[in-house]
Amino acid sequence: MSIVNEIGKEGLKRYLENCAKVADIDIEDAFKVTVNCIKAHDGASINDDDMRQMKVLENRWYASLNSETPDYSVYSDPYYFCEVWMCWVKYSRRYLKEINSFKSMSGRSIVDYIGNIDNVIDLGCGFGYTTVGMKELFPNSDIYGTNVKDNYQYKMATELGEKHNFKIVENITQIENTKSSLIFASEYFEHFDRPIEHLIEVLEYNSPKFMLIANTFNGKAIGHFNEYKHSTNRYNGKEIGRLFGKTLREYGYETVDTNCWNNRPAFWEKKSSSKSPLAKFLMD
């Protein structure tokens, strides 16, 4: 069975059972909280008490932003697993299906367009399901996922990697082949208060041929920021999104037209080896 079919109540139960192997979490309670969070995400009216643990985490995160001391410990809370499952069900799973659909490029898939490639990096791979999906789509490629080391998600993804033949690392500098073929980043760059600087780090070190990116800088979620920084300036979500695209274009990337819903993930291909000097970005 393909990983994209790992959804629904049974899929969630299996997921939480695996979570309980690495973290102290009440499976029954987490199941209810996760289901209610998904319903709320879809527009249903859900009492905050029925998803209390997630509301506590969300309030803790945004309170820390108000004091300008981001509380990154939220990622180590066992109930953050609920948030990550919702992201899988509502977003990254759909992106995997989109890029493998023959409809995504009017008669052929994005995967077909990319063709045979050496390696793929899944930035911010969560608990590893999207990385499994990448291995299914590119079975002959070396697949890597990145995540913060020693948190619960890293442990789960590492175990999946051993089972499905991919490797989890803390950051891309630990990957020996610095020129990757494809980088996939789903709801990743929003978790950095300086996403442009981080994007530049990725491009300077890696310079992939293709990038599949789904950003929601305007979206409210645990780990997202109210505003973003670049150099000495501050930007709202819409502004940083425009600057993100500008940066990619300056590095020689162009968007490839697709039929993906709402252009997510955006498909970028490196067309030119020239780029503006790094100093230009840092001074903008």
Positions of the model-derived regions?
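Conserved N-terminal segment of class I S-adenosyl-L-methionine
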Residues: 2-178, 199-200, 217, 221-284
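Conserved acidic residues
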Residues: 118, 181, 209
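A conserved beta-strand element that flanks and buttresses the S-adenosyl-L-methionine
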Residues: 184
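Hydrophobic adenine-recognition pocket in adenosine-nucleotide-binding enzymes
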Residues: 188
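Short glycine-rich, flexible loops that bind phosphorylated cofactors or substrates
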Residues: 191-192, 220
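A short, conserved alpha-helix within the catalytic core of class I
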Residues: 192-202
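Conserved helix-to-beta-strand junction in the class I
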Residues: 204-206
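Conserved beta-strand signature within the Rossmann-like core of class I S-adenosyl-L-methionine
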Residues: 208-217
